Each structure stands twice: as C-alpha cells, then as structure tokens.
Amino acid sequence: MSPNVSRLCRWQIILVLVSMLTSTIAGGSPSSRFFLQPHDRVVFYGDSITEQRLYTNDVATFVHTRFPKLPVTFINSGVGGDKVGGGWAGPLNVRLARDVFPFRPTVVVVMLGMNDVLRGHPLSAYEQGYQLLVAKLKKHLPHVRLVLIGPSPFGDSATPNKINDRLIVMSRFVQRLAKQNGGLFVDFNAPLVSAMARIGQTSPKLASKLIPGKIHPGASGQLLMATALLKAWHAPSTVTAVQIQARPLATIRSDHTTISLLSRHAGRLTWTQQDTALPFPIMNLHAHCPQFPPISRTWTINSLVIELPYSGPPQLAAFTNPLAQQVLRITHFYRTLDAQTLMVNGLNAGNYTLRINNSIVGTFTQGQLAAGINLAKYNTPMLQQAYRTLRQVWRISSMRYFAWRQLELTLYASTANQTQTYVASPWVHVKPGRIDNTSAAQRAVKQILAGYSKLVHLQQLRLFHMMPALPTHYELSPAAGPNAHSGGK
C-alpha cells in the first residue's frame, strides 16, 4: 500500500469515528453547540413579563423534553414593576441577594426596560443601572454566563410608537453591553413586531392579541420569545428522524432513537422505538391560556376546598388556537425546532394506517410516507408524555412562586419600622397584617417555607424520574378506507 493511500485510509477512519461521536452526542444529550450544559442552574431575572412564567416555562419544557437526561434547573425570579434598579420587592442589592445569588446560577437571563420606559426614566439612568446590575452579577458569580435580552415591544400592532422606539434604543444598548461583557444578546422586540405585521396583513384583530393590553405578551407572543431564545441557544431542530425501507426490510436512519424488532408480515410493518427525546408540547395550541397564570387551582370535594399547584391550562381536543397556529406557521416551528420525522420507502401504492401503542395516529398515502411525515404534529403517545412533562414544569414553577412570593417575601420585605407585611395566601391561611420579626407567626411561616422548599426539590426530582421517553410500538398496515387524512395539530 502506498503512503498516500495509507494516509487516505487513516483520514477516512478518523472521519467515520468523528461522525459516530457526533451522532452519539446529539442523541439525548446536548451537543457542544447547545448553550446549556449538564448541571446548569438558570435564573430568569426581570419584571412582570418574566413573572408571567410563559416564555420561561416554554424554554424549560423544551429543554426537559429535548434532553430528558440533562440535569438542568430553572428558577423564575421575575417581579412585576421591576426596573434595572429594583422595585417594590426591594432595591437591586436586595433582589440579587435574595432572588438570584442563593441559587448559585451558572446562567442568568435578564430582561428589563419596560418599567424604566413607562416611568419616564432617562436612557442614561437605564444604562448606568444595567451596567451596575451586570457588574454585581459578575462580581458575585465570576463564572456566570449572561444572557441579556432586548425588551419585548410596547403596543398591540406593528405601528411605530414613541415608547417602543425608546425600547429599541435601549435594546441596542443591551446588545453592546452583552458584547462588552462576553454575554449573549437575544432580541425579543423585533420578532414580535415582525409577527404582528405579518399576521396583521390578514387579521389585524388576531395580531393585536399577541400583546393584549400593549405591555404583556400573551402565550402566543411569549412562544415567539421562547423560540427566539432557543434559536439563540442553538437548540436542535430534530426530535427524532427515522427512515425505514419496506423492501428489502431495513432501517436506513434512526437519529436520536433505537429501533428494534423490525418485521414485515402480510403487508404490515411493525417495530419498536426507544427515543431519546420527546416532541415539544405547545401549551396554548389546544388550550385557553390565561395571560397571567394563577399559582394554584381550586378543587371542591364535599364542600372542602383544596388548593393544588397550577399545572397549566387544560388541553381541549376540540379547540385549536388560531393565533398559536399563525405563530407556528411564520416561525416554521415544526421544521426549525420540532421535527419528528418518519419516512417509509418501498411501500406499495395505497393508504396506510399508522398506530403507535395501539392508538391510531393517522392514515397516510404511500407518497406521504415516502416523503416523510412529522409526528410532532400528531396526538401520539410521545406527545402525551411531553404534556405530562409540561404540567410538571408548571407545578414546580407554581410551587416555587408560592413559596417565594407569598412566604419568603413576607420574611424579607421589611418596612422602615422593622415590621413585615404579610400577604393573604390561597394555600396557607395566614391572616394579613403587620407583625414583628420575632413573632410566632413569622416562625411558623419560616417552617412552612422550609417545607415548601423541600417539596419543590422533590417535585424537581419527580420531573427527572418522568424521563426518558418511554418505548413505543409502531404498526403500519394497509388502510381499510379509500381516503388518507393528514390529521395532526
């Protein structure tokens, strides 16, 4: 063998090994391109737009379903009314010391600016306050990775307005600040304005619902925000990608899944998949999602009122949210962030019914299956498991919100005369009022807070135990009826 051929063979072997390694990394664990890594602790810091817990829970749900084995925790520390210098929940020093630093975050995501604009603060004050915020984060958390977000827009249409013009100027400053401090900048303003313009061309009324009330984006608007953040984090587009050849019977492709028991009998194909990821459960596609989600839901049993943590809006099979549909369309969401493709080649002409775990997913033509279908659009067992994950993410955020806002803040928000103001709680019936720092009531609240902190931790462990994706059994058989249907979301 000549030296040139020998070198060529060595390079071919190296390329094959690199390809195998890349494929292994991509399945079920983040690649080096994805922003989050094992054991990251992510704190979302901001105002009421963050406090809504919509885009933050979308992001958390995406990460937990796309990377089921990735140990990452998410904490929402958004407070309504906050500015770069703080707000009613305390000045900046208090906010950071109580609501950020104790979690030892490796990633801090910041979005602030709306209240600074609405209260008429000059741009210079915003810039100085933001610089101080970043400096304190870097001093206390030397290795923190900063994600600075250009604030979401003001207004319920794409028509320019003075308030949003100021937000855009602030966003440009945030972009420069992120670059100066080695952080990542993500723009939330432009995607929402662009979406309002595109949807408004055919349905202005529908477009106005992206930001009801002009300040707080609804669930569809915040899905756009989550999409922008996930793309900036290099989130992978693929859930799974499967290609099966019917004749001769073979597995051609099995990205992010393991295929076993592939067989063909009397025109019927069957196989089993063990996926390493789940499709993304879109919270408001088949649900009426409140703009400001509650922290709990009430159940009445034999006149006994029980409060349980809010686990997201109920999914309604007969309802499809037209605004969510438009957002998915203009962002090409299923192609760019939620591709769960199944391709079957070599079938005879005709229609075929796909069943997963004995449940009918849909009936498809031979041509549709050869081109590939995106299972993320269908009500599959995998999507149902993903919705269970979504509900658990909401339970955790609701319990954390309750423990923090209705217990912890009563212990820390001291007034000038060293007393505490207690807020009425829907879970713990503490009488509202002012009590001193040494009272039995405050000690009781501390005990309850400690108990809820443990409960939140247990719920986080339960979330990880819900993973990974469960094995699924596929059956593709000739359809009895003459017509195919696409079904799906």
PLM region spans:
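Bacterial N-terminal signal peptides
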Residues: 12-23
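Serine-esterase "nucleophile elbow" of acetyl-processing enzymes
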Residues: 15, 26-80, 95-104, 225, ...
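Conserved catalytic region of serine esterases and O-acyltransferases that act on ester linkages
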Residues: 37, 208-214, 219-489
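Substrate-gating cap/lid alpha-helix
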Residues: 156-188, 330-344
